[in-house]
Amino acid sequence: MFLFTIENFHDRLKTERLYLSYRKLMYKEAFEIVQNRHCAEDAVSESFVRIIDNLHKIDEQDCLKTRSFLVIICQNVAKNMYNKKIYLNNQPDAYDDVLPEDVSESSDSLDILVKKETLSEIAGIIKNLDPIYRDVFLLKNVHGLSRAEIAAIFGISEEAVKKRLVRAKSKILKELEKRGELA
């Protein structure tokens, strides 16, 4: 299995503990997407191959953060497997609309908002984002992954990651404006 590819003994133990703790949850999440037992098992295995590459970013003590990180990776591996299975990976993205010019990935707007808004309000908005934006946003801003690392996890280009981050921030800002929270 994938554990034999890990040379460092402590990393191997950490991976094994993560696998034993989260495999059932990851399987459940993958199965909901692919609706096939074997594909769900493959998605969990493939997820751990990707997790091993980012093992240094996982803190076993922070269970909620670790859980969300592992679930996001597994869900996206399962989605990629599902899309490949039904040959949708060559279709143009339905969300590929024109980006607003006034929002950029490096915009400090959200940093300012964290000071103005309660975290629970922002968390509620993020939770309701389309998963394609939410997952990239969380991996970047909560888990601290680089665009390159996120691109590798999702099997997309860094430019696609950048677009999704910009769109996520734009959607968050629009929702806050809609709620009248922004001046």
Locate each region found by the language model.
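Structural recognition of an alpha-helix C-terminal capping motif at a helix-to-coil junction
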Residues: 28, 42-49, 64-76
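Arg/Lys-rich amphipathic alpha helix in sigma70-family domain 2
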Residues: 72-93
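DNA-recognition helix of helix-turn-helix
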Residues: 148, 152-178
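N-terminal module of bacterial RNA polymerase sigma factors
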Residues: 1-25, 53-55, 110, 181-183
